[in-house]
Curated annotation (Swiss-Prot):
The gene is maf. Its main location: nucleus. This is Transcription factor Maf. The lineage of its organism: Eukaryota, Metazoa, Chordata, Craniata, Vertebrata. PANTHER family: TRANSCRIPTION FACTOR MAF (PTHR10129:SF9). Residues 176-187, 222-232 have a biased composition (Basic residues). Keywords: Activator, DNA-binding, Nucleus, Repressor, Transcription, Transcription regulation. It comes from Xenopus tropicalis (Western clawed frog). Acts as a transcriptional activator or repressor. The keyword Repressor applies. Pfam families: bZIP_Maf, Maf_N.
Length: 352
């Protein structure tokens, strides 16, 4: 132990702070327990399995003692027909078992082993989803081949419906939030586009309708419908009068937790309604002011006519008084002119 510490002391840093930090600890009280790595036993077991016919000899594969030999990976027996199995089935068998990594044999740390296990579980889920989709598409292609050959009997129609339902289920597993809103919509779409004649006459049309139903199920327009219902919900929540009369602070309080697009749309609608109301108010005020001015104009015209009538009456009275004065002046001058010659003959004398 002392020799090992002496050998490792040459690797220590030479800075004074680091040496003081190391000297604070008693390194002799730490015991290092070494366990022998059983690599020879694992290699011998793998050698026996390789001699028996197993093909799993890569260093990253699972330990040979934990996984049973696969019938598809072993040497084919005569007449067994195992060579006809597809590569997809072999890949499915290999991904069905979790890989058990031995960190001592591979030189991994415990953190690397945990990360490898986590990534392995994610890869298994993705591989299972891909296998479900691949199986659904293979069945769907076989159904289209049956339909294009001239007709589709009743049991083939049932298998095609099962394939379509499997594809829809796989798509819903990838998009669960779409499946909840549009499951009934996609089923109704399939029932609506499938022709009633499933026997001999409608092979091509049934294939096209089934493909359209699959496309509709894989690509549901969930966002548009959800957005449309969202708009209807907020349009019902706030009427036009409430949007116009509500203050900005109250509107912001009511719109907490709403999406940014919806807030912008409602505020634009409120601004449009307020501008429309302002324009209507200005138009009403202009019309009202026009009526007031027209009424005042009529009153002024009536007053002008009345004043004209008064002026004409006063002119007639003046003319009448003038004629009367002239008559009085002429008659008085004739009576007093012969008897009294000293009296002034000017008309101002009678006026005084």
């Amino acid at each position: 132990m002392a020799s090992e510490l002496a050998m490792s002391s040459s690797d220590l840093p030479t800075s004074p702070l680091a040496m003081e930090y190391v000297n604070d600890f008693d390194l002799m009280k730490f015991e290092v327990k070494k366990e022998p790595v059983e690599t020879d036993r694992i290699i011998s077991q793998c050698g026996r399995l390789i001699a028996g016919g197993s093909l799993s000899s890569t260093p990253m594969s699972t330990p040979c003692s934990s996984v049973p030999p696969s019938p598809s990976f072993s040497a084919p027996s005569p007449g067994s027909g195992s060579e006809q199995k597809s590569h997809l089935e072999d890949y499915y068998w290999m991904s069905a078992y979790p890989q058990q990594i031995n960190p001592e044999a591979l030189g991994f740390s415990p953190e690397d082993a945990v990360e490898a296990l986590i990534s392995n579980s994610n890869q298994q889920q993705q591989q299972q989803q891909q296998q479900q989709l691949q199986a659904g598409y293979d069945g769907f292609a076989r159904g289209q081949q049956y339909a294009s050959s001239g007709g589709m009997p009743g049991e083939d129609m049932g298998s095609a419906a099962a394939v379509v339902s499997a594809v829809i289920a796989a798509a819903a597993a990838q998009n669960p939030h779409h499946h909840h809103h549009h499951h009934h919509h996609s089923v109704g779409h399939q029932a609506g586009v499938q022709p009633p004649g499933g026997g001999t006459g409608g092979g091509g049309s049934s294939g096209s309708s089934t493909s359209s139903s699959v496309v509709g199920a894989l690509h549901p327009p969930a966002a548009h419908h959800h957005h449309h219902h969202h708009h209807l919900h907020f349009d019902d929540r706030f009427s036009d009068e409430q949007l116009v009369t509500m203050s900005v602070r109250e509107l912001n309080r009511q719109l907490r937790g709403v999406s940014k697009e919806e807030v912008i749309r409602l505020k634009q609608k409120r601004r449009t309604l307020k501008n429309r109301g302002y324009a209507q108010s200005c138009r009403f005020k202009r019309v009202q002011q026009r009526h007031v001015l027209e009424s005042e104009k009529n009153q002024l015209l009536q007053q002008v006519e009345h004043l004209k009538q008064e002026i004409s009456r006063l002119l007639r009275e003046r003319d009448a008084y003038k004629e009367k004065y002239e008559k009085l002046l002429g008659s008085g001058f004739r009576e007093n002119g012969s008897s009294n010659s000293d009296n002034p003959s000017s008309p101002e004398y009678f006026m005084s």
